Amino acid sequence: MSVTAVGKDHVGVRSKRQGQFGQVMHRLRKNKVAMIGLSIMIVLIVIAILSPWITPYNYAKTSKADRYALPSWQHLFGCDGMGRDILSRIMYGARASLFLGLMSTIVATVVGVLLGSLVGYYGGKVDNIVMRILDIIQAIPGMLLSIAISAALGSGIGNTILALSIGGIPMTVRLLRGSILTVRKQEYIEAAEKINCSKWRVITSHILPNSIAPVIVSVTMGIGNTILQAASLSYIGLGVQPPTPEWGAMLSEGKSMITKYPHLCIFPGLAIMLVVLCLNMLGDGLRDAMDPKLKN
Amino acid sequence: MIRYIGKRLLWMIPVMLGIAILIFSIMYICPGDPASSLLGPSASAVELAAKREEMGLNDPYIVRLGRYLYQTFIKFDLGTSYKFGTSVFAGLMERMQYTLVIALLCMALQVFVGTPLGIAAATHHNGIADRICMFLALLGVSIPAFWLALMLVLIFAVNLGWLPTSGVSNGLASFILPCIANSFAGIASQARHTRSSMLEVIRSDYIVTAKAKGLSEKTVLFRHALPNALIPIITIVGNGMGMMLGGTVIIENVFAIPGVGRYMTDAINSRDYPVVMGGVLILGLIFSLIMLLVDIVYAFVDPRIKAQYEGRKGKK
Amino acid sequence: MKKFLSLVLALVMALSMASFASAEQGKSVVVGLAGDPGNIGPFQGMGLGRIGILFTTYEMLMVKDGDTFRGCLMKELTKVDDLTYDVELYDYIVDQAGNKLTASDIKFCFETAKADGNLPKLSSVDSVEVLSDYVARFHFTALAAGDLESLLMECPIVTQAAYEASADKMATDPITTSPYQVVDYKTGSTITYKRNENYWQKDELTVTTSRHNVDEITFKIIPDPVQMVNALKAKEIDISAAIDGSYISDFMGVEGFDVTQIPDNTTKYLIFNFDSIPNAAERQAIAYAVDVDDIIAFAFDGIGYHAKTVGNNKYPDFVESWNDEEYYEYDDDKAQALFAEAGVTAGKTYRLIYNVADDNTRIATTIQAALGDYGINVTLIPYDNALFGTYKYDDKKSGEWDIMLDEGGSSNLLTNVWKLTLDSRDQTYGKTVGHVADEKLQSLIEAAINDNSPENMDAFHQYLKEQCYEYGLVSKVNNLAHTTVVTRAATCFRGQILPGACEY
């Protein structure tokens, strides 16, 4: 155990020169799998940004003749029930889906990690009050929370992100709290406190690196679900309105045709899968890079 | 420990009150008209207005809130569903039998399939087992539940005819496909969390020390590594159980299972206030109890956490 | 862990025991139902789902049998004066528990239903007076054309004795006069009915809705449309009216299956918000710019027909000549000319509000694409059912939409479809749903409602068409797909399957 404590100090010393962030990035860059994940993500984001200019067809152009057209050279991914080109819709849909998915994941994670560290570090009354409030919030069905947000705050991109992220916060807090509880009383933390490290510093450079792993795993796996969820928000005044494509909505539109025209579901499904895959590759790398036990 | 549990149980009272007030307020500000779903699409605006008046929906917020709290906490009456005309509590319990079976079976699958998969992956880090396990896990979290469910139905019910397509009238057979479809994501996430936290622990110095001491792989794994990797796993299981007892709408819809999820979603969509408010309260109670259970299990798994519960002052 | 396992095992065993072995006796039929009826008590509102089981569960005083109105429980209807009618019952009606049905039960049912307030049409019943054992006298406050029939058809009838014997107001176990009795109701899942061997009516006098050609009927609630198709393919259900249009070809002309197509009584129509589109030319331009053929192709897989007014053409008060009239057929030239006349230029934006459903989304998207051809933007505002209901009728929300996609139908008269949105007396703010306060429109609809003579009907129709406050798009068609166990599918006037009247 004492070895770990020394290891932590070592990190602390180096961070003075390089900064902890830089160090993590340095290790992350050396992780091939993570870099592949990151590159694909960047490609997807670039496609999303450029989509208005590079889609093969207009994403909203309907055509009676092309209804449910199967994949072909004209339409690589086929066409949907309104004869719209699925490839173009996926490319354009990346804008809303990636933006909403990533942003709400980030918001949920940041808020969740902040609350989780507070709760885990201070324990006692803080823990009890915050966790009971989370109990209350988690008891409310997500759909109702979203409707309430839409009704009280109105529509708009910010509120959509709020509606999508609010459901992910309690899980993040709980995971982090659980991990922090196990490291909270370890010797190296107490040692850090004894040498008068600031609380912020104890949390950010000693507690979090040792307890964040479950959060990274859960966050990177949750993004697929978040993208799917966005589809249900468009009925309650939030989210993206048709015909602007969005992967979750494309999937749910194709749902009733799934046995008849499976390509309506398969391609947006694959797109979501690709994002989940990349984020997981990246997340695994990040976790390893942040793990103080895994030094080169 | 007993004191801690007692204190937490006492905390349930403000939590329940909080849930009641919050859900009531949310239903109050949510637009949507219970009268219109009761009277159907052919009712005119004048007729709807009369029905709303009769239902007491035009009273001021504070009057309705007071009435609701009095009903719930003094008379212990959750009210009667607008749509079903039967008691909310009875309705919820009737639905709960199906949800409970699904939740228990799914959690069993998740724990007994997901955990070993995760351990296998961690101990063979970057090996074949790891790759297969992680691929399955990624499939699990990225395949939408409805897609998996419909594919299973197509294969096992429509083409092979082994199992019913939907419904609950065929005993256990009715629950096989829903449970598989529903637990796939859970197994995946369980496997991944287990792998991740096992990896974390395996890299720890004391495991290295234990191995160096010449202890057998198995002993190290199950006596030293697993218990220390359990905390995130318990969190996931606890959270998953709490969520699943709230019902899984997608699976219940696809398989036409009259579970809690469909009951609540229908109620939300038709603004069946008594069902939504009563259901949220009961599910919230169950959820809080499970979270308490999770905290208690933490203490059993890790004595350090127990010490924290029992008062930090003595320790500091 | 052992305890946990044994708990699971115990649960599993309890469940498998509870699953009943279906006793194969006589003919039985399983009907797939998309909506959940919920409370099946007699005096509930007409929510979706309920309508599917209504005629199997209950009998009314009167029903619509084909195109004619016939007494079901009622033997004779006598007019006393304009607002007073005597209803004579058959004198041998008994319910499933053996209670005799008399005039006092009629009084009880109408009074209870009116007090419950779920059947708003009954508000025009002033009182019911018991004249003798089998004659009840109805006093009405007002009667427009067709009102008498719809009132007598509206209220399900049960005996007071049976109703009061029920612990939950018959929410789960109704005892009725119908030939089928509920024997098992698994809420949210299945409702099973057994034929009542002692059904009161003589065969030759039995109306279609009360026929009983099969021994056992099970309604199975299957909310997912793909699963409805799967259940029929696996022959777990015998018939369903909720098979999505694009899957119909899987059953048409396929061995072991058959499809019956019947017109649905609902019609999709557009309502223009007068506050934001006060110019008739502008409204007409939009109507001409939308191609209904596209809508039928995209939203209904080619199965549906052009509406000729706000409502379909199957109602008795529909005027035949409208079928041959030009009614906002797609016309590019006219649309362009009218847009120009109204001063609408490219870049203009309309907000289209609709109730979210697959077909509505597609209709809305088609309209959006059609107007897009003129450089006009359409913002789609979909709402779920509860929210749409609120926005549709809420005066304060009317500033948030320009065009509304709505649908409506009636069990008897076209005027009742018009009334839903076009009679300002039925709105809380004294205008139509489209915020039109047009005295001429109001006087014409009142005339048509009071007396639905072809002249009155035509006058209103022509004025509405000319002003284009609202216009009909598509009348839907119901697809009844069934296994060959059912040799002839039968439906009620509301387009719902009548399992007892199907032939086997």
Language model regions located:
Chain C
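Structural transition elements
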Residues: 8, 304-341, 359-360
